[in-house]
Amino acid sequence: MFKELDRLGYEAYLDKYPFHRELGIDLKAYIKEKGGLNKKSLKNKSESVDVNNKVPYPVELDDLIRLHFLVTTRKVTTILEFGVGKSTKVFDHALNVNKNKYESYVTNNLRRSNKFECHSVDTSRKWIKTTRKQFQTDNVRYHYTKCHVSTFNGRICTMYKKLPNICPDFIYLDAPDQYSPRGNVRGISTRHADRLPMAGDLLAIEHFLLPGTLIAVDGRTANARFLRANFQRSWRYHYFKNFDQHFFELDESPLGVWNNRQMKFTSAEDK
């Protein structure tokens, strides 16, 4: 999945698409502090489960590079993002790249009603406002909604109250956190430091997704395993342990002529 990126190199990719500048990241200082683009920062045991933590996690530039790479190389047209933040700006930048290259072809040859749009869902009006203020975007639509503890086929999980009515070809799952979902089922909720995020929204919309759709799950291993155990269609699954990301690709034959065109467009190499 990332062989081309590994061959090119992460720094070379940023030279080609310097989106880090729009994030306000000093690349030399970042590399010096981290010891390299691929070095991970070890979080303390409570950082990701502290209900009082209001500080965004430090940027992981290598993760953002991979997301940008996937959007540009797969010629993604419509993104559904769970959780706003720096990734939102990265998706906006990557969609601009795709729009500049492929807008004419997509408009004239594919059936994409929300072409070159990123729809970002979040439970926090504050973080949406902060992200809007911090990053100017051309292609992002923000969606505030509540999230509740619910069930899928009797299994406890969380569900957003409302999702954007779109047909994404790329989905990024990085939310909700443990403490945003409200309510409980038989006394069980995710609002506990020893619980785990367990979003079930993608299971509910699975049969609306088109063959070729790619899902990226950032960390959230228990959630990724929950999805894998409950998906009903034919998904190819990849887990990259060294950077803790999970990927699901809907590996089915095209649904019809328009889906077939899109899949060929996505897989075709630029000349």
Language-model-detected regions and their locations in the chain:
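S-adenosyl-L-methionine
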Residues: 124-167
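Short SAM/SAH-binding signature in class I
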Residues: 161-175, 181
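Conserved class I S-adenosyl-L-methionine
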Residues: 75-85
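A short helix->loop->beta-strand "cap" motif at the edges of active sites that frequently abuts
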Residues: 99, 114-116, 210-213
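Conserved SAM-binding loop of SAM-dependent methyltransferases across substrates and taxa
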Residues: 86-111
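C-terminal substrate-binding/active-site "lid" region of AdoMet-derived donor-dependent transferases
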Residues: 177-271
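Class I SAM-dependent methyltransferase Rossmann-like catalytic core
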Residues: 28-75, 89-93
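N-terminal auxiliary segments of SAM/dcSAM-dependent transferases
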Residues: 1-28
